[in-house]
């Protein structure tokens, strides 16, 4: 069975996710309209600017369709995508996670570090990254930085505060594809 992965493509860094998935031989659909959800099995919500993304979701009238899709299918949110999916936000509230926007600093504070993930070391790029300030009891913490979670999963939802698509390492995307 082939899997078709959608990448929400109305704002933010969607192209790098699409390129990473294509390098893995995955069929990619750039999601811009409500009917695009009918053609995909799972979805990536990329980084970008969460307030701008919310405004565009509302303007393009896809917020409700996005919420419905994300509640039933595997979804991966990176950076702003994690904010959109988190509880305590005015967004989708689909994962028991609270975040602090720009918790790791402003653009000038961006950094690259190595993280432990599934027994291996992966590179992680943090750009105006959210800090995960509270994780629910039913959350699986998959990677930490400075003893704080930065990659977590709850059921069908995977979120990272960093940008795995900006590295050569496809481990996190492969994990998502196997959820």
Swiss-Prot record:
UniProt keywords, alphabetically: Glutamine amidotransferase, Hydrolase, Lyase, Pyridoxal phosphate
Annotated metabolic or biological route of this protein: Cofactor biosynthesis; pyridoxal 5'-phosphate biosynthesis
Active site: 79 (nucleophile), 163 (charge relay system), 165 (charge relay system)
GO cellular component: cytosol; glutaminase complex
EC number, UniProt record: 4.3.3.6, 3.5.1.2
Function: Catalyzes the hydrolysis of glutamine to glutamate and ammonia as part of the biosynthesis of pyridoxal 5'-phosphate. The resulting ammonia molecule is channeled to the active site of PdxS.
PANTHER family with a match to the protein in the record: PYRIDOXAL 5'-PHOSPHATE SYNTHASE SUBUNIT SNO, PYRIDOXAL 5'-PHOSPHATE SYNTHASE SUBUNIT SNO1-RELATED
Quaternary structure note: In the presence of PdxS, forms a dodecamer of heterodimers. Only shows activity in the heterodimer.
Family: Belongs to the glutaminase PdxT/SNO family.
Protein name: Pyridoxal 5'-phosphate synthase subunit PdxT
Organism field: Francisella philomiragia subsp. philomiragia (strain ATCC 25017 / CCUG 19701 / FSC 153 / O#319-036)
Gene name linked to the record: pdxT
């Amino acid at each position: 069975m082939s899997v078709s992965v959608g990448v929400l493509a109305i704002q933010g860094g969607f192209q790098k996710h699409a390129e990473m998935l294509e390098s893995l031989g995955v069929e990619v659909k750039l999601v811009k309209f409500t009917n695009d959800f009918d053609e995909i099995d799972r979805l990536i919500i990329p980084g970008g600017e969460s307030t701008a993304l919310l405004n565009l979701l509302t303007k393009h009238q896809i917020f409700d369709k996005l919420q419905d899709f994300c509640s039933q299918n595997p979804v991966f949110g990176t950076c702003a995508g994690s904010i959109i999916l988190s509880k305590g936000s005015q967004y989708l509230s689909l994962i028991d996670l609270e975040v602090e926007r720009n918790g790791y600093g402003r653009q000038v504070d961006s950094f690259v570090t190595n993280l432990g993930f599934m027994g291996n070391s992966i590179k992680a790029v943090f750009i105006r990254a959210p800090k995960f300030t509270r994780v629910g009891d039913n959350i699986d913490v998959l990677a930490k930085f400075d003893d704080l979670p930065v990659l977590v999963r709850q059921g069908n939802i995977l979120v990272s505060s960093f940008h795995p698509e900006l590295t050569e390492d496809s481990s996190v995307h492969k994990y998502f594809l196997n959820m």
